[in-house]
Structure formats: structure tokens, C-alpha cells
From Swiss-Prot:
<keyword id="KW-0210">Decarboxylase</keyword>
<comment type="similarity">
    <text>Belongs to the PPi-type phosphoenolpyruvate carboxykinase family.</text>
</comment>
<keyword id="KW-0175">Coiled coil</keyword>
<keyword id="KW-0963">Cytoplasm</keyword>
<feature type="coiled-coil region">
    <location>
        <begin position="1083"/>
        <end position="1129"/>
    </location>
</feature>
<dbReference type="GO" id="GO:0070208">
    <property type="term" value="P:protein heterotrimerization"/>
</dbReference>
<comment type="subunit">
    <text>Monomer and trimer; forms heterotrimers with PEPCK2 and PEPCK3.</text>
</comment>
<dbReference type="GO" id="GO:0005829">
    <property type="term" value="C:cytosol"/>
</dbReference>
<protein>
    <recommendedName>
        <fullName>PPi-type phosphoenolpyruvate carboxykinase 1</fullName>
        <ecNumber>4.1.1.38</ecNumber>
    </recommendedName>
</protein>
<keyword id="KW-0456">Lyase</keyword>
<dbReference type="GO" id="GO:0030585">
    <property type="term" value="F:phosphoenolpyruvate carboxykinase (diphosphate) activity"/>
</dbReference>
<comment type="function">
    <text>Inorganic pyrophosphate (PPi)-dependent phosphoenolpyruvate carboxykinase, which regulates the carbon flow of the central metabolism by fixing CO(2) to phosphoenolpyruvate to produce oxaloacetate. Can also produce pyruvate and diphosphate from phosphoenolpyruvate and phosphate.</text>
</comment>
Length: 1151
């Protein structure tokens, strides 16, 4: 949520302290450190440093011991030395150390072969050699018992082993120089490392067997001059401290650890290794797969992977994964942590790592200048609310209450409260007497049911209004979403796409008469089915939403009614809706005297005013016209406020499926067996602010770029002189919002010591053929909004708690409500490398898929071109193909079961384009949560939407004599959907999406047919990979049948249309199957084995380190209690409804 009132973004690092710590650590390593005043203290503690250094050299971090044991065992058959994991690295055990090490102390830039780095006014700017990642030919997996999927390149063990040696022992000297020491006489050449504990399984409070949050562990190594990559990774996933210390040993926190360990090594120099040096075979001795994947050589000087970037994994089902990355682009580093979270989730069970965005979304409305709380809090009592919230609120003598945590920002008022802007008061009765408190801005006034009212300044019109936010929420979850598909946008505030105008009339008298004629019309016989409904527009019992629908032609209305409303000029409709939104009963029909125009030069003007203030009108962009530059703009309803959103996910999500029978407090289950609880794995979000190139449009990014402490990449640095020239263009300078503009002006004025600055609209210049162009992949790390504004986060959950009548001591659960994935579409295009990109132009704005077709979408995850990476096509299963080190059937099995257990329905929205001619950017991604949050729960169900004509099956389409089945594309929204549900947002909802917008085949049938064939061919090709590599055998029965049908058109006589096949996806059939029960038993067996192993490790540690006995004995008691429960029959009954653990990886193991 965009909020400038909550102070700065990142905590400011104490650079002096961190530099002193860096000096101390370098001294302990026996290395030279930069000489400056703050280093003098080191001389005093030199003897102590020597003692620490000597002890440090003799210790091995427990994670490294686990990793080394795995490597020794895994490569034993190779008959070559296994390299030792370096134990003399510079360990980043304090947040911010990596940032300090990225530059020499008194320099503001550092340049090397792999990176150009700058200290800038807003933080740090790092521009790596490549400005984006590629996924083509990048992902290599070492041979093991677990099959290497056909979409990855299989690497012989000997090749990985030699790469590992070359990574650690062969790094070039200049790569090892730590920038902080670059100016020293003897620069320190060393590896730098970071220990992390990223979340894998969210904890579920109060639920036995699920209550402990579980993390994996990971040790990340980089050559010294790439320390900025660790600064980046730490900023996203946190810092788990020094891995050598017992207090940080994951195995001594057994209930918080999945039992899995990982390592990652950056080694860009490996692109210079030859295939022969790696031990790849000559082509004459290569297998067919090695020839196909070019993992063999003809000439001795052939480079491994043709000298291009690659990531190489070594893993099996034992729970250890090691990765070598031959590049230093930040995206690869982040995605590597994602890969290891995914690996751990798939082996552990219960959980999924999801490529998802998501937000708690609560509808919000303009309540006008006065309102009565009783109409929003029916059935709730202030006294009952107080009783259930004794620990979190303080009741005042006057009869209202304040929050204990945020007493100035959250005030609780009785259900009979009356809010009035005119006298700035909230009045209510207490002990038989009327009480009044002051109504002030920036305060949440909370009714007993959680409904929140805020005094809001609309800013541009200077009009104050009451904003009402409902406590009922929809957690919109956007999984399986391709790059550029709108993961971040689902949680962004739509206000950036809204702009405001004023209302005008040509002839006040004539237009007021026309409005009155509309008000006087009899609308009671409008329904085509003959139903009579009294509906005078100004009747207080008739809502603004009803009036919007009444004034919009619809198939539900008679032809006569539709003709009448279609003949009303748009300006009259707008004026009628404006008057309805302002109208009060006490006006007694006299609205005309309240709406005025000024007299100018003795004549009536044209600008409409209410209470001497201009009447505003708001508009929203929904895509572009066919010229792809002109905005398609639509007027918003007069009571519209953007939904109140709390971001829950952005890119990397850990989720757990919990049986609803185990939850301690109620949720909206609708009788479903389980629900999904999500947690964001990231502390900061790697944002690509595409719209920031338009000055003044992306307010959040411009605000972020005005404050210090940021990690920024792929922007163009400006010196003070360059910025001075840049700001001379005053017209364009003032197109920025105030924070960005002032930041630039302050820099030019020399108000700080920074040598460089970046502008949010000017991305890094990169080579494109023979010219320089702005990078299409600008990035920065944004602090999570929910962490930046804890009061807003607290208020969101408090409102939900009050609405559910839960006490403040009971656990509150906010599971996923709606699954709304995203696809990125494109017309036929020619890429910059000259390659033709086929169209992906069959999707309407929103589709619903039944499970088989939804799984087909997830298996192929097709996408159009995205600024994040090179190329287009399939992103692999659940869009995680490139980042999944285990066979994708494990993820797909989990996804299918999750949808079944939770009873979720799969919707998919469009980004970039709808059909070949309507460019929509991310406007649909922003719009869908607004609509979904305003729908009732039963209205979100596909069955209801289909029965009422709001969803229609995609039709079969014939082109050049060939018929393309609509079944593959599921269902899509209809014109009736837009009229009915868009009416909660737009004044003229039927104008937003014309027929060809909703039916892309009407835009260009030839492109539609080509798109369909592209999807069909991709479906077949991707499915065939599962058959070729044998991993189809790891698929659960319904998924296995689907993959074979995609590959071959049939399976055991069944096609996709067969009743027998579709019944395989029935929830009861699946949850009563033997293969599902096996998953539950597998989870139990694995957990019992892990807990026994944990006990052995705890006892061994006590024997070796008696000083830890008191702490570890408590852990032992907790583990024994957990073990007793997990070993019981009760546990198996309790976890029925979860996804259990997929046994397939373990069945692959030969020992």
C-alpha cells in the first residue's frame, strides 16, 4: 500500500560500525585491512583477535560438514579427489556487511570484469555484465538415482566434480579480490559466504503437527569481488548468522528445520572450461542424449555449454543439494534460493513452493459526508467486542476504546455511532447520554464488526469524504504465473492507473431537466422475466450499484428498457449517478439547488460545483486502443475507492495445505476439506517497475527512489553535472511526483556527499546492435509493504478477527480464497535477434478451467515475451521449470492434490494483450482483485457463474477447414459478467470491454488459429518429454493419464472428453484412493525417521559440548513429544486432507 506517512523505507545501516567489524574480521583472517581512524581500536584487541582466529581455523560449520559428507559419498565412484568446502571464507554474519565490502571505504564506485557498482544517493547501484537472465540451455543436473528431466541437460558426475574443483580452486585472482580491500597494498583475495535459513513450511498456530514453521538451510559462496550478490541475497532472504556457532546450527533446532541442506557457488570463470577438461566424452563414445544435448566434444577446444551461462545442480532424495552458477546476474542468485526452497518442500511434503503473487483484498467505498454506523455493523455489539478483546484495547470513560498497540491510529467506536464531516464529529450514546469525539484524518475508526471508517482527503479536488473499508476479505492467490503475468500487480494499488477530472455542463437548465426526466422514469418493469421491482433512483433503499445496473443495457432487461437507457446521453448518466451518490433524504427531492455553477462575466459557467467545491470525476485506464499508444479510459463509479490491499505474496511463496478440521477458530470453508496458508519467503521484493518510465505514473517507485538504503540494478547513474543538465528541462522535471523531483533537486544542490544518483524513469543504457537503448529489465529491491507499515498490517488482521467474533487470544487464520493465475499473451512478433515469436492470442481477459484443462495450462505454462528474460514459449510446469531440480511431476502431483483438498477453482487472467489487437499491459491484473473482492463468496464459484450466464464455454472455431476445440480453453467471461460485476466499479460498465475484447477470435481468425496450434503443439511436445524421460511414471493416476493423452491423444482407450477420464479427477475418488493414502504414510515414515535422527544428533552434541546440555535437553523433550504424536494412528487421521509427501523421489533411490 502506497503510504508516505510511515517514514523511511530501509533501516539506515551504521556504516562506521560495519567497517570496524569488517576490519576486525579481516584481521582475524590474517589479512590487511584499509587503514583509517576507526581501525585503531583493532590494535587494542589484537591478542584476542589472534586467539579467535586460531580457534576459528580449527572449526568446521555444521552445515559444511553435512555438505562435505554428501559430496564425499556422492562422488566416491568417480575415483578423483573431492574438493574441500572452503572453511576460511569471510563470513557475512551481520546484516549490511556485504554492502560495506562491495566498495573501497573512500570510493563511490567499483568496476571489475563482471560488475559496475556505484554508491548513489538512494543506496547502491550494481549493473552486472548482463542485464537479464536466459533460460535456454542454462539448467544442468548431475546424474543420480532421481531421473534428470528431459527439459534439463544431464551432466555426468565427473563433469560436476571437476567443475566443483575448478570453482573453488581455479577462481581467477582478480575475481577473489574483496572490493573493500582493493586499495590496500595487498588486497584480500578470498571467498565470501552467507548462511541463510529460508522458510519452506509456514507454521499454523495452534494446530498440532503443523504449528512449527520449518526452514531449510543454505550456505552461499561467492568470489570476493561478487560480494554484492550476497548483499542482494541477504536483502531478500535474511541472514542466519555465523554457521560455525552452535546457536545457529539448524540441526539443533530440529522442529524448525526440514532436515535439508544446500550450497550454492558463484563461478563465472567456469564458462572458459572446455568439455574435455570437464571429462565429457568424445562424440564417438557419447550416448544419444549426450549428443542431443551437446554434452560431448569433437574438437578439444570446445567450451562447456559453448561458453554460455549455466547452472549445474547435484542432488538426490537424501536431502542435500549443491549448485554451481557460472554467472553473477542477481536474478540467478535469487532463483537459486527459490530452487532450494522448492527442493526442500517437495522432499518434505505438506508444503509447496509457489511462483505466486497475492493479497488480502477488502472492498472500499466512498460513504459521502455523513453516515450511520448501524447500517454497516448489524448484528454486532460494542460490549461483546470489548469482552473478546480485553488484551488488545483500552476502554475510555466516554464509551469508546483505543488500541493498546496503536492508540493514536486505531479507535473503536460503538455500533450506534454517527459520523459527520460538517461538524467533524462522531456521536454515540453511552450510559443514556450522547457523547462526541473529534473526527480526524489518518485514524482508523473501527466498528464492532471490523468495518473501518477513515476521514479521507481526495487531494486533487480538496474534497473530504468518509471512506468505508469492509472487514470481509478475499485472499487472491496468483500461483503458476509466468514472467510478466502480473504476480506483483495483483497486490498493487490500482490508484496509479486512476486520474481525476472535473464535471462540466454545456447548458445547466437543459441538462438538469434531462436528469430529472431520468429520475421520474418508472423502472419497476425493467426485467425481461416480468418481475416487478420498485426502484425510484433517489429512494435511499436503492443503492448506487443498483442504479448503475438500471442505467446499463442488459440481457436481463426488456428491449423497451434497454432502448430507453441506451438513448440517454453519457453526460446525463454521469450527472444522474453523481447526484445519486450525493443525495440525502432531507433534501426531499430538491437536488437542483445543491448543484451549482459559478457566474463568469455575468453568465453561468460550465464547471459543476457542490458546496462551492468542483465536482470531481475519476477515470481508470483499461488497456490501449489499437494504435497501442492511446489509452482506453473509463469513468469510475462515484462511490468507488480502490480496494484496501495487504500484500501477502510477490514471487516466492511457501504454502501449506491444512485440514480444516484441525483449525482452532472458524474460517470460510464452505465445507471444504482443507485450506491453503501462505507465507512470503522474501523480506524485500525484486521489483521491475515497468511503468516508472512514464514520469509521475508509478508513485510508489518514485517515492521509493527518493529515500536512501536501496539496492538498485539496471539503471543509468548520473553525476552531479549530468543531473544538473537533466533537471534544466523544467517541464519534464515537474512531470515527476514531488518526492522524486525533490530528490533530484536536492542532489543537484549538493545537499549530500553522494557522487551519483539515478532517476526512476531512466534505465541503464545497454547495447542493442549498433545503438544504445534503455534496459527493459530495470530492478530494485522494495521493502515489503506489510513490514514497512505494521500498523496497516495489524489493522487488516484486526478487522478480520472482529468480523469473525474471535477473541484476541485465539489464532486467526487467513487462508487463500481465490486462485487467479496469470498468463502473458502476445501478437505475432519479431524478437531483437530476428527470431519470429508465434502469437499467443486466444485468451480473453479471464478464463475458468476445469481441472484437466487447468493442469494442461500448468504443465506447459506458456508465455509471451517478457522483459525479465530472453525469449518466449513454455516456462515449464507451474512456471517453475527452469528452477526445479527434481522431476516436475512432484510439483504437479502436489498442485493437483492441493486444488482437490481445498476445493479451489482455477481462474487465469491475461496480461500484456487480449487477442492480438488489444494491448492491456497489467491493467487486467490490477482490475481482477477489485472485482473479486466485491463479489459474494457464492458468486466466485464457477457453477454459479456458468448457471447465470456470466461464464460461457469457449466455442469451437473453424478456420481453413480445420476445427479448433474450445474445450482446451475452458470458459471465459461474458458481456453479462462485465455489465453485472463491472457495475461495482464503472459508471458505464458495458463500454469497458467490447465484444471482440471478450472474444479474441473476432479480432483476427488467422492469428487465433495459429495461436491455438502453437498451444496444441506445445502441449504435445512438453507432455512427450515426461514420457521420454520416464518421469510420467511418477505422476499420480489422473495426472499420468492426462500427460499420456496430451502426448498421444489417448490413454487406455480414454480421451480428454471421456467420462471415465474426467471422473479420475473427482475429489472423493482421489481422497479415497490407495495412492493418496500412501502419501500420508510416506509423510509419517519420513518424519519419524527424521525425528529419531534429530534425537541422535542432539545427544551426540550434548556429549561433545556439555555446556549446551540445559538448552538441548529442552529440545530433546520437545522432539520426543512430537515423535510420540507423529508415530501414532491419530497423526495419520489428523493429516488426512493434507497433501502428505510424494513417495516418488524416494522410490528412485537405490539405497
Amino acid at each position: 500500500m502506497f503510504n508516505q506517512e510511515k517514514g523511511t523505507d530501509y533501516p539506515i545501516l551504521n556504516i562506521q560500525e560495519l567497517e570496524a567489524l569488517a576490519d576486525l574480521k579481516l584481521s582475524a583472517m590474517g589479512k590487511e585491512y584499509p587503514k583509517h581512524d576507526k581501525s585503531d581500536a583493532i590494535d587494542v584487541v589484537a591478542p584476542l583477535v589472534d586467539i579467535i582466529a586460531e580457534g576459528d581455523q580449527e572449526s568446521t560449520a555444521p552445515i559444511d560438514a553435512r555438505l562435505q559428507t554428501f559430496l564425499n559419498s556422492y562422488f566416491a565412484e568417480c575415483g578423483e579427489e573431492v574438493p574441500k568446502i572452503p572453511d576460511n571464507t569471510f563470513i557475512l554474519d551481520r546484516e549490511g556487511l556485504g554492502r560495506v565490502l562491495s566498495f573501497p571505504p573512500h570510493k563511490q564506485e567499483f568496476f571489475c570484469e563482471t560488475m559496475k557498482s556505484y554508491k548513489i544517493k538512494q543506496g547502491v547501484l550494481h549493473n552486472p555484465a548482463k542485464d537479464k537472465r536466459t533460460t535456454v540451455g542454462v539448467f544442468h543436473i548431475c546424474q543420480s538415482d532421481v531421473p534428470v528431466p528431459a527439459d534439463k541437460i544431464e551432466c555426468p558426475k565427473i563433469a560436476f566434480l571437476r567443475m566443483l574443483k575448478a570453482a573453488f580452486y581455479g577462481a581467477p585472482d582478480d575475481h577473489l579480490i574483496i572490493p573493500y580491500t582493493a586499495e590496500c597494498k595487498e588486497p584480500t583475495r578470498s571467498w565470501v559466504s552467507l548462511y541463510m535459513r529460508p522458510v519452506v513450511v509456514p507454521g499454523v498456530k495452534g494446530v498440532k503437527g503443523f504449528e512449527h514453521e520449518k526452514a531449510t538451510e543454505m550456505h552461499f559462496f561467492v568470489p570476493g569481488n561478487m560480494v554484492s550478490c550476497l548483499d542482494f541475497v541477504e536483502s531478500v532472504f535474511g541472514n542466519a548468522g555465523n554457521p560455525r556457532l552452535s546457536k545457529n546450527d539448524a540441526a539443533l533446532d530440529p522442529l524448525g528445520w526440514t532436515g535439508h541442506s544446500g550450497m550454492a557457488i558463484l563461478a563465472p570463470h567456469l564458462t572458459r572450461m572446455t568439455k574435455k577438461e570437464c571429462g565429457l566424452p568424445h562424440i564417438s563414445q557419447a550416448t544419444e542424449r549426450q549428443k542431443r544435448e551437446r554434452m560431448c566434444w569433437e574438437k578439444e577446444d570446445e567450451l562447456y555449454n559453448d561458453g554460455k551461462t549455466f547452472k549445474m545442480y547435484c542432488r538426490d532424495a537424501s536431502g542435500v543439494i549443491c549448485t554451481i552458477i557460472a554467472d553473477n546476474y542477481f536474478g540467478y542468485c535469487k532463483k537459486e534460493v527459490k530452487t532450494q526452497i522448492s527442493y526442500s518442500a517437495n522432499l518434505y511434503g505438506f508444503a509447496e513452493e509457489e511462483h505466486a503473487g497475492g493479497a488480502v483484498t477488502r472492498p472500499s467505498y466512498d460513504l459521502g459526508e455523513a453516515c450511520k454506523a448501524v447500517q454497516y455493523a448489524e448484528g454486532y455489539k460494542f460490549s461483546e467486542m470489548v469482552e473478546k478483546n480485553k488484551h488488545s484495547i483500552i476502554v475510555k470513560e466516554e464509551g469508546y476504546a483505543v488500541d493498546k498497540k496503536y492508540p493514536e491510529g486505531i479507535i473503536y467506536v460503538p455500533e450506534d455511532s454517527v459520523f459527520t464531516i460538517e461538524d467533524a464529529s462522531i456521536k454515540f450514546n453511552h450510559n443514556g447520554k450522547e457523547e462526541s469525539i473529534l473526527l480526524t484524518p489518518k485514524v482508523n475508526y473501527v466498528l464492532p464488526n471490523g468495518y473501518t471508517i477513515i476521514l479521507h482527503d481526495t487531494m486533487t479536488s480538496r474534497r473530504w469524504t468518509l471512506r468505508g473499508i469492509l472487514p470481509q476479505y478475499t485472499l487472491c492467490h496468483k500461483p503458476c504465473t509466468v514472467s510478466g503475468g502480473g504476480k506483483s500487480e495483483i497486490s498493487k494499488n490500482i490508484s496509479d492507473a486512476i486520474f481525476e477530472g472535473k464535471m462540466f455542463v454545456n447548458n445547466k437548465e437543459e441538462e438538469f431537466k434531462a436528469v430529472q426526466k431520468v429520475f421520474d422514469h418508472d423502472f419497476s418493469r425493467r426485467y425481461a422475466d416480468g418481475e416487478i421491482k420498485s426502484a425510484h433512483i433517489l429512494d435511499p433503499n436503492v443503492t448506487l450499484g443498483t442504479v448503475v445496473k438500471m442505467l446499463t443495457p442488459s440481457s436481463f432487461f426488456t428491449e423497451e428498457h434497454n432502448e430507453f437507457v441506451a438513448a440517454i446521453p453519457p453526460m446525463i448518466v454521469e450527472l444522474a449517478l453523481t447526484i445519486k451518490s450525493l443525495y440525502r433524504e432531507e433534501w426531499k427531492g430538491d437536488w437542483q439547488s445543491r448543484i451549482t455553477v459559478d457566474k463568469i462575466n455575468g453568465k453561468e459557467g460550465h464547471e459543476l460545483k457542490y458546496r462551492k467545491m468542483p465536482l470531481p470525476s475519476q477515470y481508470l485506464r483499461v488497456g490501449f486502443e489499437r494504435d497501442e499508444t492511446t489509452w482506453r479510459v473509463f469513468q469510475l463509479r462515484k462511490d468507488f475507492f480502490p480496494a484496501a490491499k495487504l500484500q501477502m505474496e510477490d514471487d516466492i511463496t511457501a504454502s501449506v495445505i491444512v485440514p480444516t478440521k484441525l483449525l482452532k477458530t472458524p474460517i470460510n470453508t464452505n465445507g471444504k476439506k482443507a485450506c491453503k496458508i501462505v507465507k512470503n519467503c522474501e523480506l524485500r521484493l525484486f521489483q521491475r517497475p515497468d511503468d516508472a518510465v512514464f514520469r509521475g505514473y508509478d508513485k510508489q517507485t518514485e517515492y521509493d527512489f527518493s529515500i536512501p538504503g536501496h539496492f538498485i540494478s539496471n539503471y543509468q547513474p548520473m553525476t552531479r553535472e549530468e543531473a544538473k543538465d537533466f533537471t534544466k528541462d523544467v517541464v519534464r522535471l515537474y512531470q515527476y511526483t514531488e518526492p522524486m523531483r525533490k530528490c533530484l533537486q536536492d542532489f543537484v544542490a549538493g545537499k549530500d556527499e553522494a557522487k551519483y544518483i539515478v532517476s526512476s524513469s531512466h534505465t541503464r543504457l545497454v547495447q542493442d546492435g549498433d545503438k544504445l537503448v534503455g534496459s527493459k529489465n530495470p530492478r530494485y529491491l522494495q521493502r515489503r509493504p506489510d513490514m514497512l507499515d505494521p500498523e496497516y498490517t495489524y489493522m487488516t488482521f484486526k478487522a478480520i478477527q472482529l468480523f469473525r467474533k474471535i477473541s484476541d487470544e485465539e489464532p486467526l487464520y487467513t487462508p487463500v480464497d481465490a486462485v487467479l493465475s496469470g498468463r502473458r499473451n502476445n501478437p505475432p512478433q519479431v524478437a531483437k535477434n530476428g527470431m519470429k515469436l508465434r502469437p499467443l492470442s486466444v485468451f480473453a481477459p479471464l478464463h475458468y478451467f476445469e481441472l484437466p484443462e487447468l493442469l494442461m495450462e500448468c504443465i506447459t505454462s506458456m508465455t509471451g515475451a517478457s522483459p525479465s528474460m530472453f525469449g518466449a514459449g513454455s516456462e515449464g510446469a507451474l512456471t517453475k521449470g527452469p528452477f526445479n531440480s527434481l522431476p516436475a511431476v512432484v510439483d504437479l502431483n502436489n498442485y493437483l492434490l492441493g486444488m482437490i483438498c481445498c476445493g479451489y477453482s482455477g481462474f487465469v487472467s491475461s496480461a500484456s494483450y487480449c487477442g492480438p489487437h488489444y494491448k492491456v499491459a497489467h491493467d487486467i491484473s490490477l482490475l481482477i482483485p477489485e472485482i473479486w473482492s466485491r463479489m459474494r463468496r457464492y458468486e466466485q464459484e464457477p457453477k454459479y457463474l456458468i448457471e447465470h450466464g456470466y461464464l460461457e464455454p469457449c466455442p469451437d472455431v473453424t478456420y481453413n477447414g480445420k476445427t479448433y476445440s474450445g474445450k482446451r480453453l475452458g470458459y471465459r467471461i461474458t458481456k453479462d459478467f462485465t455489465v453485472h460485476y463491472f457495475s461495482s466499479i464503472f459508471s458505464v460498465p458495458n463500454s469497458v470491454m467490447p465484444e471482440d475484447f471478450l472474444k479474441p477470435e473476432l479480432q483476427d481468425l488467422a492469428i487465433y488459429a495459429d495461436s491455438y496450434e502453437y498451444i496444441e503443439q506445445t502441449d504435445k511436445g512438453i507432455a512427450m518429454n515426461y514420457v521420454k524421460d520416464g518421469t510420467v511414471e511418477g505422476a499420480c493416476p489422473p495426472l499420468k493419464a492426462l500427460i499420456y493423452i496430451m502426448a498421444n491423444g489417448e490413454y487406455n482407450g480414454m480421451t480428454r472428453e471421456s467420462k471415465e477420464f474426467r471422473e479420475m479427477f473427482d475429489a472423493k475418488t482421489i481422497l479415497n484412493s490407495e495412492w493418496y493414502k500412501e502419501r500420508l504414510v510416506t509423510r509419517q515414515k519420513l518424519e519419524v525417521a527424521k525425528l529419531n535422527k534429530d534425537l541422535a544428533y542432539l545427544n551426540k552434541t550434548i556429549a561433545e559440548k556439555p555446556r549446551l546440555a540445559e538448552t538441548l535437553n529442552k529440545q530433546i523433550a520437545a522432539v520426543k513429544e512430537e515423535l510420540q504424536y507423529v508415530s501414532s494412528e491419530e497423526y495419520l487421521i489428523d493429516i488426512d486432507g493434507s497433501i502428505g509427501t510424494d513417495p516418488y523421489p524416494y522410490k528412485c533411490m537405490k539405497h
